[in-house]
Amino acid sequence: MDLRIKDKVYLVTGGGSGIGGGISAALAREGAIPVILGRSPLQKGFRAEVLALQPLMHFIQTELTDGQACADAVQEAVSMYGRIDGLINCAGGNDSVSLETGVEAFRVSLERNLVHYYTMAHYCIGELKKSKGSILNVSSKTALTGQGGTSGYTAAKGAILSLTREWAASYLKDGIRVNAVVPAEVWTPLYERWVNTFPRPAEKLETIVRNIPLGHRMTTVEELADMAVFLLSPLSSHTTGQWVVVDGGYTHLDRTLTAR
């Protein structure tokens, strides 16, 4: 299927690994140009993979909690390509900042998981108006269910869902579409490392997947990335303000369905 995004330019925060890396690769596979923003250098293997798919890809090493750095990154992309067709806000991480951790840690968590979503959209919006582009925000099922012991992260992810609808409403007349994907249990290298911290990793993984109704398995990065790229593409041209949960029924389906 041709998603009709060839040669379009997409900024992907946190696009060098995990879910963001999957989205960058999926964009490149469709002929789009991913401009990857991240704090750490790209791993050589990943860079080579994306370059093989899209030689025009670009990486900007930047600190997303620095507003001026975000503005500079957007300007660098515009200077290189002359346009921005979409923004994928993905960077962040579950930092276990609980109600008892403290106010300053909570503020830092919001900076790392929420504020740069706004900052990047703020600096991209002028170019997105020109291109009638799209914004894709990556949230989390914790925004809908809670998790326990992670107030900062869940507050950020809930706010991301609210901003998705607010921005969709704000820019209807400009033809800018804004949607969110809501993952639950996605098998990324980071998730694998977390599972391996348990004394019996295989048993821990089994306790997780038995509660995922569809197939009793983890969501793959590719499955989530495919949905994200579809929502960015013209094939979803009448879809905006939506929260698309990609989780094998984990969040919403009756738990009795998980019985094997």
Q: PLM ranges: what are they?
A:
Residues 121, 156, 164:
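Active-site helix of classical SDR
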